[in-house]
């Protein structure tokens, strides 16, 4: 598998929206999201340079980005989960920023493992009610 990060140009905005709203992926986020195409376009027009798309053999497999200027967010397509895509994205993306945080749900073990594998230090996990 050949992986690379590319800019999150307009051709990928709908991919990001659908991936974020995928019921399998919703469990990994703190908030449930219902995002319209119009909302996605508006958001990405302002924030597209804070996001990258991971291509695996040329196919979009996930995204990684920065929220609030310091909070890393990422999501992997269910078809590519467990194949190192999340680890690759965090490893490639995070050196771009001097300081970033990762907020991970206490029950999101897969994401915890990604960050710990890359040497991130656990501070605290919040429990979503």
Which functions belong to the PLM regions below?
Residues 2-18:
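A short beta-loop-alpha structural element at the N-terminal edge
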Residues 24-42:
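Conserved GNAT-fold acetyl-CoA-binding loop/helix
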Residues 55, 71-85, 104-105:
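A short, internal acetyl-CoA/4′-phosphopantetheine-binding micro-motif in the GNAT/acyltransferase core
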Residues 82-95, 109-117:
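Conserved acetyl-CoA-binding loop-helix of GNAT-fold acetyltransferases
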């Amino acid at each position: 598998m050949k992986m690379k990060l590319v800019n999150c140009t307009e051709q990928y905005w709908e991919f990001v929206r659908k991936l974020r709203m995928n019921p399998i992926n919703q469990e990994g986020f703190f908030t449930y999201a219902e995002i319209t195409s119009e909302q996605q376009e508006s958001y990405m027009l302002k924030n597209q340079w804070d996001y990258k798309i991971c291509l695996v053999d040329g196919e979009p497999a996930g995204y990684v980005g920065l929220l609030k200027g310091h909070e890393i967010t990422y999501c992997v397509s269910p078809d590519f989960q467990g194949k190192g895509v999340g680890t690759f994205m965090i490893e490639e993306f995070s050196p771009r920023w001097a300081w970033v945080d990762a907020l991970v749900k206490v029950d999101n073990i897969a994401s915890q493992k990604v960050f710990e594998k890359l040497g991130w230090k656990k501070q605290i996990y919040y429990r979503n009610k």
